UniProtKB/Swiss-Prot annotation:
Gene that encodes the chain: HBD
Protein name stated in the entry: Hemoglobin subunit delta
Subunit structure: Heterotetramer of two delta chains and two alpha chains.
PANTHER family: HEMOGLOBIN FAMILY MEMBER, HEMOGLOBIN SUBUNIT BETA
Gene Ontology terms for molecular function: haptoglobin binding; heme binding; hemoglobin alpha binding; metal ion binding; organic acid binding; oxygen binding; oxygen carrier activity; peroxidase activity
Coiled-coil residues: none
Classification via InterPro entries: Globin, Globin-like_sf, Globin/Proto, Hemoglobin_b, Hemoglobin_oxygen_transport
Length: 147
């Protein structure tokens, strides 16, 4: 559960309505893989991840980034029940994929950077504060099934 004020909910929804999920998802996941290269071990089947240019241009990275942000969009529609919304994804990432839950926090912070880059002055400190709450809540929900 994420505790947002009505004003925070408004700014999150307003900005998210302008987000190009395809582009932002690919950029966020790509940046995660470049900035934190140890996360690439979960994506070995994606092919060439040998350089920043290869990662950022990789169609599988872009496609998976779109998928990740699609799930994030679902979470935005269910801010009061994030653990339930992400229960199956948490179980998958914990039990089958064995993803370090810290990676969820890293990806959330990268997403905030990408949003700031894409929206410039529109991404005010108020908007950032609201999004930091959201990505922290999503990361916590995704880590919920970990023992």
């Amino acid at each position: 559960m994420v505790h947002l004020t009505p004003e925070e909910k408004t700014v999150v929804s307003a900005l998210w309505g302008k987000v190009n999920v395809d582009a932002v998802g690919g950029e966020a996941l790509g940046r995660l893989l470049v900035v934190y290269p140890w996360t690439q071990r979960f994506f070995e089947s994606f092919g060439d991840l040998s350089s920043p240019a290869a990662v950022m241009g990789n169609p599988k990275v872009k496609a998976h980034g779109k998928k990740v942000l699609g799930a994030f969009s679902d979470g935005l529609a269910h801010l009061d029940s994030l653990k339930g919304t992400f229960s199956q994804l948490s179980e998958l990432h914990c039990d089958k994929l064995h993803v370090d839950p810290e990676n969820f926090r890293l990806l959330g912070n990268v997403l905030v950077c990408v949003l700031a880059h894409n929206f410039g002055k529109e991404f005010t400190p108020q908007v950032q504060a609201a999004y930091q709450k959201v990505v922290a809540g999503v990361a916590n929900a995704l880590a919920h099934k970990y023992h």
